[in-house]
């Protein structure tokens, strides 16, 4: 059995939501049109009215990636993290990742953020793998514009279970730790005996009152 450290990303390892900064960066780089903001706002409104539309909201926000190669978008994602997003990393979170890596934990980031940019995260933080909201590719390695199930809430344990099966691993629950900030992270955090609540929202505190509270900057 393997000791895991399971991490959310937005507001756990980095300040704020990442998809809007990513979209704005793509607009500045000329990869996405300015009108993409209108599509994103429309998608956000649909999601607020119906939370089940989360994947549709991401699809609207990221429709500009359709037809672009994975290699091209990987390079853009590296620039995004290097020039913009890395400035939002919590210093305390980075130190914790380094400590856990040194102690032999397998570190897995499980995030509702989009795979199109999250897939390069291990190049910027000491993590082993990333599970994010999937963005479909065609046979030529180009993005289709389709977005898979939103990796949030109950979807997180499902994705983790599939990952464990794929890699022939099992979680050592007693020695593993989970890190998150919102109530939607609770299903993942409760896969371990040590839920760590990072700058937690009140609903998460009510959901997991026995969790260890952490204040990260």
Give the residues covered by each predicted segment.
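Active-site neighborhood of HAD-like aspartate-dependent phosphohydrolases
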Residues: 1-50
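C-terminal cap/substrate-recognition subdomain and adjoining C-terminal extension
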Residues: 1-2, 75, 82-108, 112-217
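Acidic catalytic patch
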Residues: 66-76
